């Protein structure tokens, strides 16, 4: 129900689907208007006839759409939300349900997390209004053998990718946690001498305790194991190493050289969600796929076409995104639905390939009580 004040015009949204075999040029919709007062019977006031012009175009189902929808998934959060063991069979049943729904919307990317806390829990440790655990954990089970060598169990990562493949939503496989990790200063960086705060927890079989990789030799060995596993699985052409909102092009270039050294002659493809003009100007040659926030999209509107051509010519995708800003348009709980509706229209207007959003299924501690976070 909507409260409509007297004498004020009221808009309302009506959504439906025209059958594919509809052959007419026009469709007439009749909208019946009723009124009632208190406990009186409803009374029909009028019928509003709305003529609709029907274009001779059949849209593909969303899961077959060329629109590049890139909503980042948070599988660890699902285990917490439903109070099940991380990477257990029941956890993957829940993951399956969520990915099936996401795929029906036209999702094109599988989020694969290969280190611990790449976003440092979205700084949830600083939020007191609605305290929530928003940490994401490594899909790879890591250990160090008695011989001092790093070992990896890829079962959970492979299983996640397999589910995404089942629903045809892994056109791209984005690896989070290897580049552009957050909060090196306040959340810490365990790897001595490495400028990107990669946090990889492992079980030391010799000391029988959990530790974090703290040197570049072990880090290089670990990254090499992850990337070579994906190469051996025949997935390499779909893999991107993604950096979320990097702002230091020198550090990114240095880390890219380090990562490249772990896979020999294989070409590594990189992607960034970019919100920094300096990074956009100075690092776009190193990036194969890119998403730029709405502010940068508008600021660089005159150059968008050439940037898109540069990215597309490398076989990449150029999208745009919103995050915790701007206030409008966005997809907050408080955002009017029409702001979500215009995402596709904006994408068409800007001439971009699609849209990115970072917070699919990132539930607060008790979403039934308060599903809003920070805002």
Task: Label every model-predicted segment.
Residues 9, 24-26:
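Coil-to-beta-strand transition motifs
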Residues 8, 18, 314-317:
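N-terminal functional module detector in eukaryotic proteins
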Residues 17-20, 27-37, 46-265, 273-284, ...:
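Aromatic-lined carbohydrate-binding surfaces of glycoside hydrolases
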Residues 1-13:
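Surface-exposed binding patches on compact interaction domains or structured appendages
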